[in-house]
């Protein structure tokens, strides 16, 4: 059975309070849906969230027991070379997910450092983006 680590970045824990582009769902419901979907695929999922860059880096550095990472680094996608550097040390598939379409957001959100290393980027599909990422690991 494949084991995948899902890492969610800053402010996703208050998803229901975010801008109108975001799904109006509580974070705990997002996590429940991700886990429920993964269970139907036979993939074991561990979901973590942090508002702190260093904690996200430590999660990546300790991820060797996983077969892949699904990461929504949120605003850190556009700013964190440190997270990019940590991801470069993970030699297994990495799928970047964004709930909103970052290409249709503010100009400063249209670039993602994570995309440089990601096996695939899924953007603008809402919660279904996580399901699509899980499906990539079934292949």
Segments predicted by a language model, with ranges:
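Short, glycine-/small-residue-rich phosphate/pyrophosphate-handling segment
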Residues: 47, 95, 104-139
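Short beta-strand elements in bilobed, periplasmic/extracellular small-molecule ligand-binding domains
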Residues: 31, 37-48
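Extreme N-terminal starter segment of soluble prokaryotic enzymes
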Residues: 1-5
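N-terminal small/polar loop signature for handling phosphorylated ligands or for N-terminal nucleophile
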Residues: 51-90
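Short catalytic-loop micro-motif centered on adjacent basic/acidic residues
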Residues: 44-49, 70-72, 121
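Glycine- and acidic-residue-enriched helix-capping/strand-helix junction motifs
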Residues: 14-29
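Short glycine-rich anion-binding loops that position phosphate/pyrophosphate groups of nucleotides
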Residues: 10-12, 74-77, 100-102
